[in-house]
Amino acid sequence: MMKSIILTLNDRAEGVTADGTRVPRALPGEEITLSKENQFKIVLPSKDRITPVCTHYKSCGGCSIQHVTQSFIKEWKSNVIKSCLSARGIETIIKPILTSEINSRRRVTLHGMKTKKSVTVGFFKKNTHELISTPSCELVDPEILSAFSLFEEITLLGATRKSIIEISVTVSKAGLDLNILNGKKLENQSIMKITALCENFNVARITWNEDLLANFLNPTIEFQGIAITPPPNAFLQATEEGQEILIENAMLSVFNSDKVIDLFSGCGTFTLPAAKRSEVLAIDKTKSMLSAIEQAWRETSGLKKVTSRSQDLFKEPVGKEELNSFDSAIIDPPRVGAEAQSRELAQSHIKRISSVSCNPKTFSRDAKILVDSGFKLDWVQPIDQFLWSSHIELVAQFSR
């Protein structure tokens, strides 16, 4: 055993020693003994260390930083954003981080497997394919947890012994929206059993291997009061509270715009609220999400004109000439960011950009492109929808 002191916490929530050894779940300032297998024991704990709230924390890979105070997490996540921007030579106002409540996660992906003797539904152990049962979870909405026995029955009826099924669950206004992947082909009797079970557990819709199994009610979601029925397994923000904070801040940048372009629009999280005051063009690769936007727009009175277009913005970013016809832009790319699209925005005449990101590194890379072209990064608002993990969401305003 070797004694070490943890110097810092990296952006994956791992403690780091002087020689660069990464120690998961160790904290800065702690004195530890470290084995050759990278197993550690605490000799002198950090003043910020606390007892994890979840009974599954030691084995579950869903959370990585339940062992530390919320004040530490807030400061650390804010510093991650600040460090990423500083590395690109960018300084700005970073607003106080806003954190979602416990048990507010409305979207979750569970996995299920069965053997001759048992059924297991839950999350994987960290960095493994070993599944552990997690009938309780401090992150997840209670409505999802109350249907845990349903997920076990679905696994029993729909999984093979050679594969693990994926159970994606979203809490909608009408009930649970279930999307099952990697399930076996169901016989009519199994379909009848599963649909009957779903009716007893307030399920609005269930799809099986991308085919609709049953639609009891339309699983609607609201964006600032505008109802939409997203396609199965559509991207949505993790918590409703976090979603509304992102929308509120994103609208600050486009408030006085006549025409707005929403890049990587998804199913309209920002498109539809922006349409309360502006004409909006929504662009995304996924046609089913654009169809959901169009339907919601048709069914909602009082909105300005919304149009949509299917386009792969990685392969074919919207060019500066087209961008010049818009007053402002909203951009919410995946974790890889939007380098090519940012270069087009930088060369356009657009005056304001609302940028939403779930990755401070790629956000900072793209921000550098915009700042170098004359944009100012006015502020960044961090939102922590992913309690006890290394993930952080942010929304930011660029202007010139």
At which residue positions do the language-model features occur?
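Extended interfacial segments that mediate partner engagement and assembly in macromolecular machines
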Residues: 44-51, 58-164
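Carbohydrate-binding surface patches
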Residues: 169-183
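Short, solvent-exposed loop/turn elements at beta->coil junctions and helix N-caps
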Residues: 95-101, 166-167, 211-212, 381-385
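A short glycine-rich, hydrophobically flanked beta-strand micro-motif that places a catalytic Asp/Glu
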Residues: 162-171, 206-209
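Terminal RNA-binding accessory module
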Residues: 1-56
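Rossmann-like S-adenosyl-L-methionine
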Residues: 2-13, 183-400
